[in-house]
Design a protein with these regions (language model features):
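The feature marks the mature, well-folded catalytic cores of soluble enzymes
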Residues: 1-280
Length: 280
């Protein structure tokens, strides 16, 4: 909403990176004159810049302000809370441990609010880090999670840390909406012969939804738009389920739903209610 309002205002502004991981949304904003730059130094001096939902490091914020750039901060509040947690941890002499994908923009931004963070992708990665040096199990560690990670990954790390570490504290910072969406997708996939996951292929939440659905459903399709859906190639199924990544706008979900509803398929009725809620 912030990006669209800014685009309509007509005032010069750029986005630092894609506002969300959805190419269709980014393209739509570009059509309205709001473009993305990839590096902070590409933001014109004295202009306005939108910080994306994944957040940016403290160094980026400081650099932009020093150049007189007006920051419109669209960082997810849940992500901002993690920035505060890791900062506070280091102020108390603790080492932040970030559970997430090391190259994900959100994780990079969180790490950028620390001086000496540790990033682990999962339980095995944590185990390897802990036992590289025996003294690490006695360090004061503060665990946080990438907001779009899964409960399975987080709980695996918590279990390992509680077993091996003598001074660890845990902040479950997985987004509640993300966790709920993942669990609903898992349950829905178990009842369907085919699951359609709608979202950008580069979105971590969308890819994780597809992986979760594949655990209980043998046929999973990942599509970005309705035109990606080749109905002639869809295997027969008594029931078809639809779910979507958090960054997928309601109008794209509706396009897919309408296209599939035009065919002779029974689509899980609860999805219609979910769609109505997402449009409100």
């Amino acid at each position: 909403e912030l990006a669209e309002e800014t685009a309509f205002s007509g005032k010069p502004c750029v986005m630092l990176g894609s506002i969300i991981h959805n190419r269709n949304v980014v393209d739509r904003l570009a059509e309205k004159g709001l473009f993305a730059v990839e590096r902070p130094e590409q933001v014109p001096d004295g202009s306005r810049v939108i910080i994306r939902s994944h957040g940016e490091s403290r160094a980026v914020h400081d650099s932009l302000r020093e150049r007189g750039v007006e920051i419109l901060d669209a960082t997810c509040p849940n992500v901002t809370r993690i920035h505060q947690i890791v900062q506070g941890a280091e102020e108390r002499g603790r080492t932040p441990v970030i559970v997430g994908a090391p190259d994900h923009p959100e994780v990079l931004a969180i790490a950028g609010w620390c001086k000496g963070p540790v990033v682990v992708s999962g339980e095995k990665d944590l185990e390897n880090w802990l036992f590289q040096r025996a003294e690490r199990t006695n360090l004061p560690l503060t665990f946080v999670s990438q907001t779009t990670s899964t409960k399975k990954i987080w709980e695996g790390c918590v279990k390992k840390a509680k077993k091996e570490c003598t001074n660890a504290e845990f902040f479950d910072t997985i987004c509640g909406a993300t966790s709920k969406r993942q669990e609903e997708a898992r349950q829905l996939a178990g009842k369907c012969g085919l699951m359609v996951v709608v979202g950008d292929r580069h979105s971590s939440t969308t890819k994780r939804l597809a992986e979760i659905c594949a655990e209980t459903c043998s046929h999973v399709l990942l599509i970005e738009r309705a035109e990606d859906l080749d109905l002639s190639q869809i295997p027969p199924a008594d029931m078809v389920g639809i779910t979507a990544g958090a960054s997928t706008p309601a109008w794209i979900i509706k396009e897919v739903y309408d296209k599939m509803s035009d065919e002779i398929m029974e689509i899980e009725k609860s999805f219609a209610e979910m769609l109505e809620e997402s449009i409100k």
